[in-house]
């Protein structure tokens, strides 16, 4: 569905158009590792997670095999005895259809089977899909209980597939119609009868326990198979059915065949024994369970059911999430036909005491009172029991694992160009919640501490590396009290004001020396022997800008070069230099808001657009590391301002464009520290944070050194470099960088050098259900918490920089059905918004919704406190609230319609909440889906009626114009099949003034980033609505005439089913143009996009929906589709293909969205809507595939 302004893009055919949307997913290792299954075999435990298989006998692993986090994940774990050459094979099935088989011998896993050509088993596989497996005579039978839910028919159509690995055949073996498969198994007749008359008949029984999707009926079906191995066929049309007692939807049920002749069916309420005879199934015994918790939705562990037949005793075991184990014994001698005992006594035993609020996901019993327990907070643990009690130990080198649910999410507004951090709220269980901050951090092993020592003088405020000084001794010179020391001797015996530098040879350079009008700037260059040499450049007072280059020798300074640039004021300029040590010099000069790059021939190489909102105080210039001859190098200018902002300018032709903007988390000035010329690394730091910037891939992240830096210096060396850090205790610590790196091919290593997501968690005794980051407030967020037991709510002001609660406010003791919290502040900053009557104040609107009436609160965030300004009751059951910031207007939508109120917080003598009457409100559907203001119109979206516009002239009372007239703030209760709704406005931007550096036909972003000229936006002033359906379908609509078909029905811009249960859907604030946290994107950030929506949910997965912008992406999309259509056959592989009776399966080797955790989302580059022929769209594009 093309927009009008996209018609200039080329199309491959007239029946399709490109949809420039992409989806990226984010998971740290602990969130990615979802437990698939586990088992105990021959004294060892085996734990299968999404990205690895682990085995051991104690708290130390014996062997493990792990898979790449950005590749396909394991969805099913099965074991097959006598598999090919192995006596026991561990089969792992992946979400992309591939299968790997391993045998475990001599404490290591060895792969014995690998196929990439298995079927995808109908549809998407979830990370936590529930699989059933059974093997018989080398054939694996498997089904996914979760994957075939039909949202239209509301039925489960589960399918069992058979995998014959000897013949290479995959067949659809068995399928249900409106029935859920509880369990299935196979029984050979030889197991039943020790009778010579049965020899050669080889009868096999297929037993399947089913539950109706339409009722609570539970029944067991028996199918018979006859024939020799390899030619057996089940007659699935003929079966015998045995009706069992019904079970509730939320009641657990388990079936196991023991010793080949007895079936045990275990439910919450009863246990039934069924005997298998040659003539059929006969009832053995029936028991009512006594001692098992009979509570609705009680949480038993699904993999903890176990039935063992020993010495005429059937031993039953089951465990729950609270680490309790329940056991019962049945003596088979007391069983006979139709025998019914009233009760089966279960005994309860505490395996171990979990930490407070922690719950178990797995309890696996090992021999001799030993267990493996996987808990939601503490991960994988080994438990041993003796007479003194239980001992819990963390399994060493085990998988990182947490099981948490995300309930709310926000992108942290960092004032920069890239999304680099997230704030999320969620829970581990119904009582334990958490707030989690995700930030980018480099691995701690990147810097190795070599030495740390106290300086020879006290109160050191600065230092310099002087390791080349002839007099030897201490390799540092220190500044203390305005004096310079080395080895306890004065290097300079008079105080200085600014501009001091000490060279590596111990020579002191200071401002004013040799006529300098600015600070001396160090210029490092790499010599042919890999040693680093140093020069200094500085501006000299003159009618023209004169730049002198000094080279520091052992006892003197030698003037090496001198350059003159006309028309620039040397006194007001900041000058920095780059040199390759021989033939090339480049100078960057900052003057009057403009950065300009000059060469040694006084020729201007590149210049930036004037920007007076960014005032630089320090700068660096570097050149890319692609060409030794410097013919096609990019020039990078890194500049820092006093407000904590750092910009990276990159040359394009003769223009310097802003490629990246980073802000200090604490709004403090960031010092710049270059490394060595051969490395694309720059440090940004202050006394609260250290950031490492990698210009090779434009990534950045925090460095954790375990100290507070006061000043940092670089000491070049043959092993790359060392980082020298002075702290506030006058101690200097030396860290060696990249000791594991090698010099040859170092550029490739720098490309892959990228920080990883790290989680910082703040634990809560209640559950966070809503959160909003406070704009322009130092690292604070407003969080709504609920106690799941008392149903009482409270607000919390949270500092996500320090990860501490700042202030809380408890609502009244009344119980509410739910609460609605909405912020009353603008998402953007502009000169127009700053003229508002209470600009800068942060207000929060809260509603406590009861059965008959709703309580209204108005709070203000003031002086790090939540202050209540107003509270009153609204005599209606309110289920949504709309906040229009421009007019301080609040619309309440409830059972009685829509009511409007004006908030008068600064109007003396007036009610804070003043009722307003608007006739247009009577025509508005008060239970509609999301709304937002566009000019004088209130726009609502209804799936069956498209975007409805109602004239709502409330802007006439506005004194000040708005740069951002559309502001969506509307919260809803669940309506029909829609569970989540969010609205995203792409505001109309202003055109930049023309200048000699910009093409005249380009539009550039203005606003809080002043311009950030890297983004070309042709598609502005748009509105998107995103919804999540009950079947986990993400649907995105666009406010456009093209979004309606010929019949007037609103057509989705995109519709796709996601592989996780989505709980939180939020619009992302404006201003971002790139995604820094993009781990699946070839170690590069995703640039040139507009982030639209943030989604998260039950499986710890986070999604960001973005829109591609710029002509580069449009051309890439065009080329991608053309290549895909022309080369589709070339990507196919048919090696060792498994045959299906109706379909030939093969799996493409190309990588794409499957790497991000999706299955079958990128199979076709175009998707058509069957019911509406005019509707055409395509799937989400994976930026990884497009880049390739």
UniProtKB/Swiss-Prot annotation:
Localization, UniProt: Membrane
* Record key words, sorted: Membrane, Transmembrane, Transmembrane helix
Q: How does it sit in the membrane?
A: Multi-pass membrane protein
The record's disulfide annotation reads: none
Would you say which domain of life the source belongs to? Eukaryota
Annotated Gene Ontology cellular components are: cytoplasm; membrane; nucleus
Q: Which InterPro entries match?
A: WD40_repeat_dom_sf
What is the protein named? Uncharacterized protein YEL025C
Q: Which organism is it from?
A: Saccharomyces cerevisiae (strain ATCC 204508 / S288c)
């Amino acid at each position: 569905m093309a927009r009008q302004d996209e018609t200039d893009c080329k199309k491959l055919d007239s029946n399709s158009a490109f949809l420039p949307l992409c989806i990226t997913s984010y998971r740290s290792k602990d969130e990615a590792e979802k437990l698939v299954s586990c088992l105990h075999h021959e004294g060892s435990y085996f734990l299968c997670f999404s990205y690895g298989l682990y085995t051991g006998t104690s708290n130390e692993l014996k062997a493990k095999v792990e898979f790449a986090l950005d590749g396909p994940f394991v969805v099913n774990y099965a074991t097959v005895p006598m598999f090919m050459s192995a006596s026991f094979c561990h089969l792992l099935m992946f979400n992309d259809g591939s299968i790997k088989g391993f045998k475990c011998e001599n404490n290591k896993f060895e792969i014995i089977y690998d196929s990439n050509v298995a079927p995808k088993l109908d549809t998407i596989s979830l990370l936590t899909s529930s699989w059933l497996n059974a093997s018989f005579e080398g054939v694996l039978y498997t089904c996914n209980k979760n994957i075939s839910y039909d949202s239209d028919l509301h039925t489960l159509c589960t399918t069992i597939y058979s995998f014959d690995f000897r013949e290479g055949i995959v067949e659809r073996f068995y399928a249900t119609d409106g029935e859920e498969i509880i369990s299935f198994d196979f029984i050979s007749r030889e197991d039943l009868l020790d009778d010579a008359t049965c020899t050669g008949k080889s009868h096999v029984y297929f037993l399947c326990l089913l539950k109706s999707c339409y009722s609570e009926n539970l029944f067991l079906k028996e199918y018979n198979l006859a024939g020799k191995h390899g030619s057996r066929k089940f007659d699935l049309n003929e079966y015998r059915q045995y009706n069992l007692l019904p079970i509730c939807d939320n009641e657990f049920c388990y079936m196991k065949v023991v010793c080949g002749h007895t079936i045990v069916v275990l439910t919450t309420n009863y246990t039934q024994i069924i005997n298998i005879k040659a003539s059929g199934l006969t009832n053995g015994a029936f028991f009512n369970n006594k001692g098992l918790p009979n509570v609705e939705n009680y949480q038993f562990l699904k993999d903890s059911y176990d039935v063992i037949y020993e010495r005429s005793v059937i031993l039953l075991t089951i465990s729950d999430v609270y680490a309790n184990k329940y056991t019962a014994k049945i003596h088979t001698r007391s069983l006979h036909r139709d025998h019914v005992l009233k009760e089966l006594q279960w005994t309860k035993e505490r395996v171990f005491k979990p930490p407070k609020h922690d719950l178990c996901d797995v309890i696996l019993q090992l021999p001799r009172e030993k267990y493996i327990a996987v808990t939601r907070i503490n991960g994988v643990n080994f438990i041993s029991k003796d007479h003194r009690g239980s001992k819990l130990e963390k399994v060493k080198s085990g998988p990182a694992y947490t099981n948490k649910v995300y309930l709310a999410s926000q992108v942290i507004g960092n004032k920069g160009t890239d999304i680099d951090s997230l704030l999320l709220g969620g829970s581990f269980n119904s009582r334990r919640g958490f707030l989690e901050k995700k930030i980018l951090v480099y691995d701690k092993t990147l810097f190795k501490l070599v030495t740390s020592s106290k300086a020879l003088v006290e109160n050191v405020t600065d230092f310099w590396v002087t390791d080349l000084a002839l007099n030897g001794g201490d390799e540092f010179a220190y500044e203390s009290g305005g004096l310079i020391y080395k080895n306890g001797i004065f290097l300079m015996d008079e105080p200085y004001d600014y501009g001091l530098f000490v060279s590596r040879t111990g020579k002191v350079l200071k401002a004013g020396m040799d006529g300098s009008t600015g600070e001396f700037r160090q210029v490092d260059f790499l010599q042919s022997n890999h040693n680093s040499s140093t020069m200094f450049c500085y501006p000299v007072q003159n009618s023209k800008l004169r730049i002198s280059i000094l080279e520091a020798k052992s006892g003197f300074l030698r003037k090496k070069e001198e350059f003159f640039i006309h028309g620039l004021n040397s006194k007001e300029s900041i000058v920095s230099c780059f040199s390759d040590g021989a033939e090339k010099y480049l100078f960057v000069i900052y003057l009057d808001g403009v950065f300009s790059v000059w060469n040694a021939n006084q020729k201007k190489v590149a210049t930036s657009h004037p920007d007076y909102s960014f005032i630089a105080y320090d700068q660096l210039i570097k050149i890319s590391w692609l060409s030794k001859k410097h013919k096609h190098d990019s020039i990078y200018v890194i500049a820092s301002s006093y407000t904590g902002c750092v910009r990276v300018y990159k040359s394009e032709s003769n223009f310097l464009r802003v490629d990246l903007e980073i802000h200090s988390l604490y709004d403090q000035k960031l010092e710049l520290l270059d490394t060595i010329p051969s490395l694309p690394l720059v440090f940004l730091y202050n006394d609260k944070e250290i950031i490492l910037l990698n210009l090779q891939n434009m990534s950045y992240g925090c460095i954790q050194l375990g100290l507070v830096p006061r000043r940092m210096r670089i000491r070049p060396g043959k092993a790359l470099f060392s980082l020298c850090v002075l702290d506030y205790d006058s101690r200097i610590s030396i860290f060696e960088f990249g000791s594991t790196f090698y010099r040859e091919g170092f550029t490739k290593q720098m490309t892959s050098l990228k920080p990883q997501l790290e989680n910082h968690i703040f634990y809560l005794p209640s559950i966070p259900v809503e959160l909003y980051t406070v704009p322009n407030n130092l690292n604070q967020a407003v969080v709504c918490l609920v106690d799941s037991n008392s149903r009482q709510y409270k607000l919390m002001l949270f500092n996500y920089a320090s990860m501490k609660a700042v202030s809380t406010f408890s609502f009244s003791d009344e119980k509410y059905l739910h609460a609605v919290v909405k912020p009353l502040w603008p998402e953007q900053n502009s000169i127009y918004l700053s003229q508002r009557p209470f600009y800068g104040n942060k207000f929060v609107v809260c509603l406590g919704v009861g059965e008959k009436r709703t309580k209204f609160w108005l709070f203000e965030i003031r002086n790090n406190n939540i202050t209540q300004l107003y509270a009153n009751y609204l005599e209606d059951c309110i289920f949504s609230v709309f906040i229009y910031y421009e007019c301080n207007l609040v619309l309440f939508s409830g059972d009685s319609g829509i009511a409007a109120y004006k908030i008068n917080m600064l109007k003396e003598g007036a009610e804070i909440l003043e009722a307003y009457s608007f006739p247009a409100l009577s025509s508005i559907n008060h239970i509609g889906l999301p709304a937002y203001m566009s000019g004088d119109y209130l726009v609502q979206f209804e799936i069956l009626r498209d975007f409805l516009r109602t004239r709502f002239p409330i802007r006439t009372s506005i004194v000040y114009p708005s740069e951002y007239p559309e502001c969506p703030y509307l919260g809803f209760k669940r309506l029909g099949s829609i569970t989540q709704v969010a609205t995203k406005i792409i505001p109309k931007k202003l055109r930049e003034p023309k200048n000699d550096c910009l093409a005249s036909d380009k539009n550039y972003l203005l606003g809080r980033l002043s311009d950030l000229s890297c983004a070309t936006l042709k598609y502005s002033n748009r509105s998107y609505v995103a919804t999540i359906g009950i079947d986990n379908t993400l649907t995105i609509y666009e406010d456009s005439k093209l979004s309606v078909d010929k019949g007037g029905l609103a057509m989705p811009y995109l519709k796709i089913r996601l592989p996780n249960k989505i709980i939180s859907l939020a619009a992302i604030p404006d201003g971002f143009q790139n995604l820094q946290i993009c781990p699946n994107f070839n170690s590069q950030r995703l640039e040139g996009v507009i982030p639209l929506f943030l989604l998260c949910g039950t499986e710890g997965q986070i999604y960001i929906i973005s829109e591609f912008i710029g002509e580069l992406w449009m051309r890439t999309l065009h080329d991608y589709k053309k290549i895909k259509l022309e080369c589709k056959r070339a990507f196919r592989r048919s090696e060792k293909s498994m045959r299906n009776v109706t379909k030939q399966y093969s799996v493409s080797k190309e990588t794409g969205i499957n790497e991000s955790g999706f299955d079958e989302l990128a199979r076709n580059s175009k998707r058509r809507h069957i019911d509406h022929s005019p509707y055409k769209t395509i799937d989400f594009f994976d930026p990884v595939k497009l880049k390739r």
